[in-house]
Each structure stands twice: as structure tokens, then as C-alpha cells.
Amino acid sequence: MSSKQATSPFACAADGEDAMTQDLTSREKEEGSDQHVASHLPLHPIMHNKPHSEELPTLVSTIQQDADWDSVLSSQQRMESENNKLCSLYSFRNTSTSPHKPDEGSRDREIMTSVTFGTPERRKGSLADVVDTLKQKKLEEMTRTEQEDSSCMEKLLSKDWKEKMERLNTSELLGEIKGTPESLAEKERQLSTMITQLISLREQLLAAHDEQKKLAASQIEKQRQQMDLARQQQEQIARQQQQLLQQQHKINLLQQQIQVQGHMPPLMIPIFPHDQRTLAAAAAAQQGFLFPPGITYKPGDNYPVQFIPSTMAAAAASGLSPLQLQKGHVSHPQINQRLKGLSDRFGRNLDTFEHGGGHSYNHKQIEQLYAAQLASMQVSPGAKMPSTPQPPNTAGTVSPTGIKNEKRGTSPVTQVKDEAAAQPLNLSSRPKTAEPVKSPTSPTQNLFPASKTSPVNLPNKSSIPSPIGGSLGRGSSLDILSSLNSPALFGDQDTVMKAIQEARKMREQIQREQQQQQPHGVDGKLSSINNMGLNSCRNEKERTRFENLGPQLTGKSNEDGKLGPGVIDLTRPEDAEGSKAMNGSAAKLQQYYCWPTGGATVAEARVYRDARGRASSEPHIKRPMNAFMVWAKDERRKILQAFPDMHNSNISKILGSRWKSMSNQEKQPYYEEQARLSKIHLEKYPNYKYKPRPKRTCIVDGKKLRIGEYKQLMRSRRQEMRQFFTVGQQPQIPITTGTGVVYPGAITMATTTPSPQMTSDCSSTSASPEPSLPVIQSTYGMKTDGGSLAGNEMINGEDEMEMYDDYEDDPKSDYSSENEAPEAVSAN
């Protein structure tokens, strides 16, 4: 420290060297003038107990040390800062008026004494040498420092300052880091709380992740359980459906067995006269009729008999006449109500029934005839009843017990098989002169005479004409029935089918005879229209169309105002099915049936009902054309010009596809034209109401079929259904009388719930809209595939054109709206 402080006056030579030299020279002059005074001054306060011999080496060593220190100090910046500090300190000390500190004063005094000591020449030379050496060193240092690289200065400076900063900051930082124990405890507590918070957060995240995993797994498990449950439910539903189908099949089989055995609820309560009571009861007991217990059969008593479908089938085969019961003789309250409703509806007295042929039958005669027929229509194959002949009634009424007259019949069937002898009753008891004699070679040559005479020529006109004139139909039908009734044949379907084929052949032969003997005039057209039936006419308008054709072709008006113009042949199973379909709808008008007694042609079995739709007197108003028809009118003409032989149906398909591919902008003018035409049409016909006519095509399973194809399809389906169920119902055979009249078959009372298993055409229950009204309906037992088709499609081209002639007058009627797909408009 002493060396640095001693050399401080010389450090500022770079800034004010001239000032220093002038100061020194002035001091030397003053000292020279006052030399003698200075020599007498005491030395102790100046030297501070230091001899002169020691002061000079100290000064020289100080100068050398300063030179060495200056040589080490190579930074110009450091030199300037140090010089500035020293100069400021030196000037402060020189200019300050305050007293100096003791150490500073002692240093100054040492310098002064060292300067003033010795001779002036020596001191001047030494000072000049010192100044020169200092100047030279300064110049050398300045030139050397200018040539040095700045990086070296920065390195030295950074090293020096780094050491100083390390000495400074390490202690402070250590003090701050170490701190007090309280601060360290606080920091430790903060760190521990932060660590615990982080640990808890980590645990929360892990727990949430585990919960999410568990939730996803539970959801997957729930979905799997739901899928398993749904699959189990579907399997259970499928099993239940299969069980239901099996149960339904078993129920059908049981019901068919019940039908065969006769265990059915009562459908009809016949009334028997007293003279046939015992015989009918015995016959019914042998044939499976179920009599209620405790019934006594006394003369004058009315007793109920449970009718079963098998007896109805036999009744259909036997050809029963209409059942008319006297109101006073009916003991069952339900029958009383039904007959009263029937009498009130049609305004007829049920004591007598007038047939179309002008014959009137009273209830006594009807009862006698019905009793005889009931006793004879059920024949057990295993137990033939012994013949119980009774004397014929000579009072003019028909005696049902003339078995000897039946034995005289010349039918080939009765000659080969003596089935007629085993019958308990004879329904064809007549004088021998009235029974026509038929040759064995042509048993059916006179079955359908064209003359509309009474089927039975009896001397007494008030007597009942027997519905069965000869023994041919009854004997053959009963033989077939007894063969089909055999329990051994129910499992043998081949035998049953053979019997059915024989019956079909018989019916075809009857139809051929009928076609040969019918006149080719108006009656032929009428019968052909009637033979078309209602099976394919599934909507109301087409049936109305068929109804209206009858009076138009015959030109005959209805005798009774209550009867509608429709004519339907009930002797065909197709027509019976059509009537059943009509009866099944509650919206249809109630129908009732008149039976063919006055005439001999099949076409007289008719259904009368009110006409629906547009009356024949009303003019036909065409529909206004829609947008498609407006567009298609010209397009159709263009296509016909290009392809004259193209069918209308193909043209309509082409036009329909084109119309669908058109954009709305292209269709817009045609829609405007449609609006204009609709407005004009509304102004012209303000009361117009669109009544669509039936279409000639039927859509079945997405396919468009014609009427003939539809009929054939329905026949095949019915045949399949008939073969699917066990053959437990007796097919019915048409019964012909001696004069060739084909009589209708079964007599039924209308029930509201027809049995579903009776799918064949011989099912005779019908669902009537009013269950209180008995509907007597007749059916043939067998439906032929080929024969029925031939009978249904007997219409020639002319008749079909007459039926559909107005289709071509208004071809746009096939297009009900623009949204529907256009259908084929054909001329055939």
C-alpha cells in the first residue's frame, strides 16, 4: 500500500506532466533561497524517526516497484481510471482546506523531505531522469497497448473482474443461501408442501385414469350383456313363434278330426215333422249326430240336432233345397230372432216361399223334405243303414221313403254299386211316368236341358218338386262321399286325390254337356260372364262392373225393386269364394241368395245386390289430364309413328322412364298446362268426382299379373294350402237330378267367425256383416285346375272388349296421379 500511495503523485503525469515540472522547479527555487533556513530545521517531525540513508533506497525501490507495476498493468482503460482517481485525489488534497489526516500528512512530508534532501543538482537530475523514464515508459506502453489485441484486454479484464466478483458475490450468495434457520425451515416446509401436492395430484390422476378404465370396461360389459339379452329374447321369440306354429298346426289337425267325428258347436237346428222323427233320429244316431242328453222324441216335439261341417259337406253333395222354417214351429230363440230379422228385411212371409219358377211351398212340405234329406245326407262308410221302406204317400206330397222307386233307376252307377239300396230314405220318389229313362251308355246326355221348365213334373202343382230327380247324382255322390269318409283313407292321400280327380272329370263332363246344349245367344254370354266369378275381382269396382253386365246383355229388368242387377253364378266355387270375400267386408251391402228352382240352367243361381259406383244412365266424364299425360300425348304419337307395332305397355314404360329422368324445369310447362286443364274441367263439371275403375292387372309379390295369370296363381296357392293340411274334409260333388238340373250344395248358417282351417272350396261358413242374418250359400266341392281355368276364360275377344271398351276411350284413367308410376295401357 505504501508503494502505491508513494507513487500516486507521479501517476498523473500522462495528464499534467508540464504542470508537475513547473511545480517542482518552483519548489526548488524556494528551497534554494531558504536553504540556510532549512538546514537548521529539526528533522524529527519530518522524518518520523527515519534516517536519511533509509529514505533514498525507499524512494528508489518505490520508483522501481511503480515501474514494475506499471509494466504489469497493460490495459489503457485501467490506467486511465487509476490516473483519474489519483489525480482527483491529488487535486483534492492540494486544494482542500480541511486538515489532512495524520497518515496523509506524514506521507506528504516524507515525499517533501525526500525531495528537499540532497543537493539541488542531484535532485534535479534525479527528478529529470525519473520524469524522462516515466515519459518513455508511458510512450512505450501507449504504443504497445495500441498494438495489442482487444481480446487479450477483455480476457485479462474479465479474469481480474471475475476474481473480484467471485470474492464479492460468493460470500453474499453463501450468506443468502445459508440464510437463517427460520428461512431454511420455511423453504423446507414450502418444498415439502409442494411435494405433497404433486404426489396428491399424481394420485388423483391415476385414480381418475383407473376410474375411466373401469367405466369403459363396465360399459363394454353392459353392452355385451344387453346384446346377449337381446339375442336371448330373439331366440325366445323365435322359439315361441315356432311353438305357436306347431300348436296352430296341432289345433288345425284336432279341428279337422273334430269335424270328422262331429264334435262341433250347433250351427243349425232343423225342425222335423212327426212322421219322420224316429227314422231321422235313428239315422242321425248312426251317423254321428250328437243329441243332447235327456231328449225325448215324441210326436209334435221339436228337438235340436248339432250340425257339423261333415254333414254340411254331405248336404252340399245331396243338393238340399232352401230351408224355410215356419216361425211358429221354431223353438230356438236365436232362430226366431234370425228368421224375424230376415222376414222384416225382405218383407216376405216365411210360412211360404216362392221360387223363381212360380212354385210355392208351405212349411209342412219343406219340413218333410228337409227331414228326409237330413237323414240321408250322412252315410257312414262302415255301417250302412238297413233299408226301412215305408208306403209312399198318395196325398200328392213327396214321400221320402220310396226306396223301391230308387231301385228302379237306370243309372249305371246305381246298377254297378247297390249303394242306393242301403240308403234309409229316397228323395226322388215320383211316379214312374215322370222319371226319364236314360241309356246306360250316355248317363249325362240330358243333364242340362235348355228348356226352363220345372225340374220335376208332378201332377199336383202344390206338391214339392224334388230337388233330386234321378238316382245318378245321389248314388254316385254318396259313393264318393262314403269312400272319402273312410277313416282308413285319411292317411292315404293318393286314394283321396284319385277320388278328387274322378270328381273333377265328372264336373268337366257336365260342363262340356252344358256348353254343347246352351244356346249361343244372349244366355251364352250371360253364363260365360257368370262363370268368370268374383275370385279375381278383389275390389268393389270390378265386381260392380260384372254386375252391370248382366242386365245390359239380357236386356231384362229386375222384377223386384229390392234386387240389384248383379248376377253371379253360385254353383261355381270361384263365385262362392267371391261372395265370401264380399261378405267378409262390413262396408259391403248385405246380400241374399235366390235359388234356381224355376229354370234348368246353371246361370239362374244368382246373387242380387245393389249396384255401386256410377249408374249406367250417367254419362262418362273423362278425367283432366295431368302433367305427365299432357307430355305423353304427343310423345306417344311420335313413338307410334316411328314404331307402329309397339305395344302400349312398352310405350308407357318408355315414357315413364323418360318422364322420371326429366328435370323439374323441363316439367314446369306441363304442370302449368295441367293446372289450366283442371280449372277448365272444374268449371265445366263442378260436381265431378273421380271414381276409378278396376285395373286389369294385379300386383302380387311385386309382380304385375293379368287377371288370368292371377287366377291361375290363386288356384295353385289354394291347391298347395289344401295339400298342406291333412285331408280331413269331404270334397263335395255336384248332384244332378233326373231332368239334369245341377243343384247347389251346402246349406249353412252365417257365423261371425269362420274356421280358419277350412281353406278348401268346400268350406261353407261365411263371415257375414250381420250375424243375425242367415246366408244360404252353395258351393261345388271340387275345384278343377284345368276345368275351372277353361270355364273362367271362356270369354272370347269380343266379350272382353265389351267389358273393357271404355278403357281405350279414356287411356289416362290408368294414371291416377303424377306421383304414381305410369302403368301399361293396353288394348287387349
Curated annotation (Swiss-Prot):
GO cellular component terms listed in the entry, alphabetical order: chromatin; cytoplasm; nucleoplasm; nucleus
Phosphoserine modification, residue list: S399, S439, S442
Compositionally biased spans, kind Acidic residues: 796-809
GO molecular function, one term: RNA polymerase II cis-regulatory region sequence-specific DNA binding
Chain intervals with Polar residues compositional bias: 393-402, 439-461, 753-781
Effect of W161C: In TOLCAS; uncertain significance
Tissues expressing the protein: Expressed in a wide variety of tissues, most abundantly in skeletal musclen.
Segment forming the signal sequence: none
Covalent link (Glycyl lysine isopeptide (Lys-Gly) (interchain with G-Cter in SUMO)) residue numbers: K404, K417
Function: Transcription factor that plays a key role in several developmental processes, including neurogenesis, chondrocytes differentiation and cartilage formation. Specifically binds the 5'-AACAAT-3' DNA motif present in enhancers and super-enhancers and promotes expression of genes important for chondrogenesis. Required for overt chondrogenesis when condensed prechondrocytes differentiate into early stage chondrocytes: SOX5 and SOX6 cooperatively bind with SOX9 on active enhancers and super-enhancers associated with cartilage-specific genes, and thereby potentiate SOX9's ability to transactivate.
Disease: Tolchin-Le Caignec syndrome: An autosomal dominant disorder characterized by mildly to moderately impaired intellectual development and behavioral problems, such as autism, attention deficit and hyperactivity disorder, and aggressive episodes. Highly variable, additional features include osteochondroma, craniosynostosis, dysmorphic facies, arachnodactyly, and large head circumference.
Listed name of the protein: Transcription factor SOX-6
Gene name linked to the record: SOX6
